[in-house]
Regions:
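Long, highly charged low-complexity segments
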Residues: 1-73, 77-104, 108
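A general boundary/transition motif marking the beginning of the first structured unit of a protein
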Residues: 2-5, 40, 143, 183, ...
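Extended, non-catalytic structural segments that build the interaction scaffolds
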Residues: 212-214
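Active-site-proximal helix-loop-helix substrate-binding element of RNase H-like nuclease domains
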Residues: 33-35, 70, 74-210, 219-229
């Protein structure tokens, strides 16, 4: 993962996630030993509950879910030590309980394009709560004429580097049994880390404009945006 980020000039993400060069090897080998960036794939319910309890104590976590909600990445961590946890519907017993837990009001979340996420959660009968910041909306408020606020564009706009393409983890078979998980995992984790990095960058700029946060400002732009939050 370090070599992939280095190749893409992810200097800020390398620092953010606490990556190091580690032993030589391909992306696949480094992702199998994800410890360099303290990331993990959660397959045990006890570990799931432990992480949910931890996140309830934090002021926020960054969350990115695939459109089907079958895969979720959560990023958090202290100074210079990013951490990531990956959850997959076909690998975690009680996955729906995880979704209810992570999208509960007790866990404060930073997300990208909260409105679309809320629609998907509501369609699955889940109550989307606890969103405290939307990086897509924040980017719109700061540059309303840009036209596109996709993560791939924002990484170039604000940090002058390119992240892996979202299609790497959005493909229907990206995490299938016959797929090589290295590339989609790297893309999903880097996009989630980028959400956190954007939050750290955009929130102070919104404060300078006198806005308390992207979520609060949403009500003035779209009355339906914050419904059920």
């Amino acid at each position: 993962l370090y070599q992939l980020f280095l190749k893409l000039e992810f200097s800020k993400l390398i620092d953010k996630m606490g990556l190091s060069a580690g032993p030589a090897g391909g992306v696949e080998e480094q992702l199998q030993g994800v410890g360099a960036c303290e990331s993990e794939q959660v397959t045990d319910r006890a570990r799931m509950e432990e992480l949910l309890a931890l996140w309830r104590q934090r002021d926020h976590v960054a969350v990115l879910a695939t459109p089907t909600l079958d895969a979720v990445c959560v990023e958090w961590g202290g100074e210079g030590a990013g951490k990531a946890a990956l959850f997959f519907a076909d690998k975690l017993e009680g996955y729906n309980d995880f979704l209810r837990g992570v999208f509960s009001p007790e866990i404060k979340k930073v997300v990208h394009d909260a409105k679309t996420l809320m629609e998907r959660l509501l369609a699955e009968g889940l109550s989307p709560e606890g969103v405290v910041f939307d990086t897509a909306l924040a980017a719109y408020l700061l540059a309303p004429t840009d036209g596109s606020y996709e993560l791939e564009k924002l990484s170039v706009t604000y940090f002058n580097f390119e992240v892996p393409k979202a299609r790497d983890y959005l493909a229907p078979d990206a995490f299938g049994p016959l797929a090589d998980p290295a590339i989609p995992l790297a893309a999903l984790m880097s996009h989630t880390a980028l959400i956190e990095l954007l939050y750290q960058t955009l929130a102070p700029r919104l404060e300078e404009l006198g806005l308390r946060g992207a979520k609060t400002a949403a009500y003035a732009i779209d009355p339906d945006y914050g419904i059920a939050v």
